[in-house]
UniProtKB/Swiss-Prot annotation:
Alphabetical UniProt keywords: Oxidoreductase
Name of the protein: Peptide methionine sulfoxide reductase MsrA
InterPro entries: Met_Sox_Rdtase_MsrA_dom (IPR002569), Met_Sox_Rdtase_MsrA_sf (IPR036509), MsrA_MetSO_reductase (IPR050162)
Documented EC number(s): 1.8.4.11
Protein purpose: Has an important function as a repair enzyme for proteins that have been inactivated by oxidation. Catalyzes the reversible oxidation-reduction of methionine sulfoxide in proteins to methionine.
Organism: Lachnoclostridium phytofermentans (strain ATCC 700394 / DSM 18823 / ISDg) (Clostridium phytofermentans)
Gene Ontology molecular function: L-methionine-(S)-S-oxide reductase activity; peptide-methionine (S)-S-oxide reductase activity
PANTHER family for the chain: MITOCHONDRIAL PEPTIDE METHIONINE SULFOXIDE REDUCTASE
The family this protein is said to belong to: Belongs to the MsrA Met sulfoxide reductase family.
Catalytic site: C11
Length: 166
């Protein structure tokens, strides 16, 4: 069955590239989630405290890629204890988050985070909320690292390579 989940992993360029390489992911799109303004621009999200998170919309086939596995792969490319910071990127828009549209996904998300927490001394900082809003990012952000292969990314090439084999 095809499903959709929204994941914030810091800068959305790397998150989009990473998730798009995973077998079972059908499509990805970057945008802005769960902020306080409608139809924000990148400049507004970066400079005007809109509350939006840079987020990747992930459509996937859960018969090929169960949500549990998708979340485990997500945890491999973030620091789940870091608040509003991933790699060199800092700000509320770079927070980590799992935004669901299907309430049943909580039955998978919560135990997954409990397992993750056992691996860390610090508390897990991943925000888990129902998706309230998602606005597509500007076209130049879509598939950014495919268009700009040497563009900045906090997720390394090794992670991209392992995503292809996941």
């Amino acid at each position: 069955m095809n499903k959709t989940i929204y994941i914030a992993a810091g800068c959305f360029w790397g998150g989009e590239k990473y998730f798009s390489l995973i077998h079972g992911v059908l499509s990805t799109k970057v945008g802005y989630a769960n902020g306080t303004t409608s139809n924000p621009t990148y400049e507004e999200v970066c400079h005007n405290n809109t509350g939006h998170a840079e987020t990747v919309e992930i459509q996937y086939d859960d018969s090929i890629l169960p949500l549990e596995k998708l979340l485990r792969l997500y945890y491999e490319v973030i620091d789940p204890t870091s608040v509003n910071k991933q790699g060199g990127d800092q700000g509320i828009q770079y927070r980590t988050g799992i935004y669901y549209i299907d309430e049943a996904d909580l039955e998978i998300i919560k135990p997954s985070l409990e397992e993750l927490a056992k691996k860390y001394d610090k508390p897990i900082a991943i925000e888990v909320k129902q998706l309230l809003h998602f606005y597509d990012a500007e076209e130049y952000h879509q598939k950014y690292l495919d268009k700009n292969p040497s563009g900045y990314c906090h997720i390394g090439q090794c992670a991209f390579d392992s995503a292809k084999n996941a």
